From Swiss-Prot:
Active site: 114, 131
Natural source organism: Helicobacter pylori (strain ATCC 700392 / 26695)
Chief location: membrane
InterPro entries according to UniProt: Peptidase_A8
Membrane topology (UniProt): Multi-pass membrane protein
PANTHER family: LIPOPROTEIN SIGNAL PEPTIDASE (PTHR33695:SF1)
Annotated GO biological process: proteolysis
Entry's Gene Ontology molecular function annotations: aspartic-type endopeptidase activity; endopeptidase activity
GO terms for cellular component: plasma membrane
Protein name: Lipoprotein signal peptidase
Amino acid sequence: MLKTTKKSLLVFMGVFFLIFGVDQAIKYAILEGFRYESLMIDIVLVFNKGVAFSLLSFLEGGLKYLQILLILGLFIFLMRQRELFKNHAIEFGMVFGAGVSNVLDRFVHGGVVDYVYYHYGFDFAIFNFADVMIDVGVGVLLLKQFFFKQKQNKIKA
C-alpha cells in the first residue's frame, strides 16, 4: 500500500509541475506582449479578479486566501483518501497544478492572467490553459467514477 501511495504521489507531483510550468510559461508569453486575432479566437490579456465568469470578484484580495485554504483543505482530504488519490493521481495533479498556478497569478499580478477569447457566433468568457486543465481533470475524474460505478453495478448483478 505504501509503495502504491508513493508512486501515486510521484505521478501527482509530475503532472502538477508539468501543468503548473506550462501554464506559467504561456502566461509569461502573454504578459510579454504576445497577441493574436482571428474570426473565432483572440489572444488578449485580461486580469480576472474573480473566479469562473468573474464570480466572487467582490471579495477582491481576500479571494486568494480563500482559494489557498480550499486547495490545502482538499489536499489534506485527498491524503486521507488513499484509494481515491491513487486512482486519480493524474487528474488531481492537473487540477491542483492549474489551481495553484491561478492562485499564484493573484499574488503576483493582482488577478488571474486570462487570455483566450472565443467569440465565434457568441461571446464566451475569457479563460486560460489552467482553466482548461481544471475542466479536463474534473471531467476525466467524473467519467472514470461513472464508468467505475457502472462496472461495479454489473459485477454485483
